[in-house]
Amino acid sequence: MLTKDELDYLSKIPENKKVSIKPFDLEGKKIGESIVQKIRNYLPDLEVLFMGSVALKIAGQKDIDIYALANPKDFNKYLPTFEKLFGVPAKQGKYVKKTFIEWKFKKNGYEVEVYLTEPPERQIRVFEILKSNKKLLKEYEDLKLSFDGKSYKDYQKAKYEFYNNILDA
């Protein structure tokens, strides 16, 4: 069963959008780790997580996901540093400055997304489960690879279903 937020996100994906899955590449992991370190150098008390397929060392969309965790009421305290490091936030929608602020940029062929966000508990749990269970991690990578060149909406839906299944187990 998909959540309301998952269904909402899926409804916004164009029908003709395709997904491209690439093999894991150590360079992406190094880029992610360097961005995390850069944030920690400026904000040593902020919890920063590197999650997603690159952090898990599996095939993925060649994107890097970094999460800096903070209470939304403290976002203004951190915003000047993040803008200094990453420029103007990319996400200017209804969520900005409420539950997350997002920066997007490219680095050495990787799409990088940096979030100043309240802790995404479900996402963190899924990441920790996959990191600690090699069998599930392999199933997840196989799922991702099976969607290469196919519908992004179907891919995202399958990932959500996979997440919900492992969270319910």
Would you name each region that the model predicts?
Residues 1-49, 160-163:
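Helical scaffold of the NTase/Pol beta-like nucleotidyltransferase catalytic core
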Residues 4, 117-169:
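Catalytic cores of NTP-dependent nucleotidyl/adenyl transfer enzymes across multiple folds
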Residues 20-26, 67, 126-129:
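Short histidine-centered catalytic/ligand-binding loop motif
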Residues 77-86:
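Short amphipathic alpha-helices in soluble, non-transmembrane regions
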Residues 86-120:
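Conserved catalytic core of two-metal-ion nucleotidyltransferases
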Residues 36-64, 68-74:
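Active-site nucleotide-donor binding segment shared across nucleotidyl transfer reactions
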Residues 12-14, 58-61, 106:
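Short, flexible turn/loop "capping" segments at secondary-structure junctions
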